[in-house]
């Protein structure tokens, strides 16, 4: 029973990581490299990805 509880808790923690650290922008993109200067300008970090043709920046 402890093993199942531990695995369930671990799964919840892993699934909840990263839900709030990404910030969407209205800037359209075709590749993640297009988002890097946008994220640097808006949020001061080069960490960004192109998701659903929009830049998403991470802190």
UniProtKB/Swiss-Prot annotation:
Pfam families: Toxin_2. It is found in: Secreted. The modification Pyrrolidone carboxylic acid is found at residue 23. InterPro entries: Scorpion_toxin-like_sf, Scorpion_toxinS_K_inh. GO terms for molecular function: ion channel inhibitor activity; potassium channel regulator activity; toxin activity. Disulfide bonds join 29-50, 35-55, 39-57. Its main location: secreted. Expressed by the venom gland. The keyword Signal applies. The record marks 58 as: Aromatic residue of the functional dyad. Belongs to the short scorpion toxin superfamily. Potassium channel inhibitor family. Alpha-KTx 01 subfamily. Has the structural arrangement of an alpha-helix connected to a beta-sheet by disulfide bonds (CSalpha/beta). This is Potassium channel toxin alpha-KTx 1.14.
């Amino acid at each position: 029973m402890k093993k199942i509880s531990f695995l369930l808790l671990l799964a919840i923690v892993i699934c909840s990581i990263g839900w709030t650290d990404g910030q969407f922008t209205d800037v359209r993109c075709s590749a993640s490299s297009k988002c890097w200067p946008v994220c640097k300008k808006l949020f001061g970090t080069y960490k960004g990805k192109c998701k659903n043709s929009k830049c998403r920046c991470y802190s």
